[in-house]
Amino acid sequence: MSGKTKARRAAMFFRRCSEDASGSASGNALLSEDENPDANGVTRSWKIILSTMLTLTFLLVGLLNHQWLKETDVPQKSRQLYAIIAEYGSRLYKYQARLRMPKEQLELLKKESQNLENNFRQILFLIEQIDVLKALLRDMKDGMDNNHNWNTHGDPVEDPDHTEEVSNLVNYVLKKLREDQVEMADYALKSAGASIIEAGTSESYKNNKAKLYWHGIGFLNHEMPPDIILQPDVYPGKCWAFPGSQGHTLIKLATKIIPTAVTMEHISEKVSPSGNISSAPKEFSVYGITKKCEGEEIFLGQFIYNKTGTTVQTFELQHAVSEYLLCVKLNIFSNWGHPKYTCLYRFRVHGTPGKHI
């Protein structure tokens, strides 16, 4: 039975009791006037009874109304329940997201660890170079002390040939220290946002024998990805190798530019584990790509990397363009004699960015 029905029945019961009480009261009043001398006491009794019944009626109606309100409160409680479920669902999702974060942080930690390892190896390489330079300078000083000529007065006389030799040595040292300073922005730098488009890039060279030999050291690991050429760390073995002497790669630059020059870098024979750099690229060409790396190829120039020159060689583009390009394609036609693979260490692209940059 619903709360409303109970309330209506209670109200009808109250009206009937009131009518009966009124009728009885009227009859008693007449009786008290005509026949009953003790009418005041009876009237007070009926008043007590009526007050009690009225109080009980109000209590009953209030109880029924309270029950009805509780029944009508169910939809609101349902909405509250749904809100609680949604809140706990949101908390569960956030908790799961927090559980996933350590895995992502672990991957980031691995990358940072690899970068630290690469930097450490590069520091060791630079320390070796510094030791070599110190040895050269020490030999130069010893040579200066031991190769003075003396005149009849006992004063030292400098040998012109020896002075020229020392000057050449100093110039060589200064040249080696300056040769990596291109002093132009590199828009093919991975850390700046550049990337390799795999669909436009040759397959990497795979050599299980090389993997076993260099495992744990990192030299010429066939797992080296193509985007290694977009990173500044250059030391023996950290290169992208592709089969044979011909290959290509498509580079998405960090931003749109009007390209003006490119730079290719390789290690020198002095630091090569094999003692030669026959896997270095030789002839190569550069193209600009329009329309989001899928449009027409614009020829920018063809060049030769000289293995006997400096390790870092910059080439001015032979054909100027007037439109801003986002992608550059590098085609390599030959190497310096290696029969199995070509190894590319670093490739840079220079130019003028858009005015909005």
UniProtKB/Swiss-Prot annotation:
Q: Which residue ranges are assigned to the Perinuclear space compartment in the record's topology? A: 65-357
Where in or outside the cell is it found? Membrane; Nucleus envelope; Nucleus inner membrane
The protein's topology relative to the membrane is:
Single-pass membrane protein
Q: Which domain of life is it from?
A: Eukaryota
Question: Which intervals lie on the Nuclear side per UniProt?
Answer: 1-47
Note the coiled coil stretches, chain numbering.
98-146
Give the SUN domain ranges: 193-354
Gene Ontology terms, cellular component aspect? Answer: meiotic nuclear membrane microtubule tethering complex; nuclear envelope; nuclear inner membrane
List all membrane-crossing ranges. 48-64
GO molecular function ontology, one term from the record: protein-membrane adaptor activity
User: Keywords, A to Z?
Assistant: Coiled coil, Membrane, Nucleus, Transmembrane, Transmembrane helix
The UniProt entry, under Pfam families, shows:
Sad1_UNC
User: What is known about what this protein does?
Assistant: As a probable component of the LINC (LInker of Nucleoskeleton and Cytoskeleton) complex, involved in the connection between the nuclear lamina and the cytoskeleton. The nucleocytoplasmic interactions established by the LINC complex play an important role in the transmission of mechanical forces across the nuclear envelope and in nuclear movement and positioning. May be involved in nuclear remodeling during sperm head formation in spermatogenesis. A probable SUN3:SYNE1 LINC complex may tether spermatid nuclei to posterior cytoskeletal structures such as the manchette.
**Domain text:** The short coiled coil domain is proposed to be not involved in load-bearing and force transmission from the cytoskeleton but in mere nucleus anchorage instead.
Quaternary assembly: Self-associates. Interacts with SYNE1 and SPAG4/SUN4. Proposed to form a spermatogenesis-specific LINC complex with SYNE1 during sperm head formation possibly implicating a SUN domain-based heterotrimer with SPAG4/SUN4 associating with SYNE1.
Protein name, entry field: SUN domain-containing protein 3
Provide the gene name from the record: SUN3
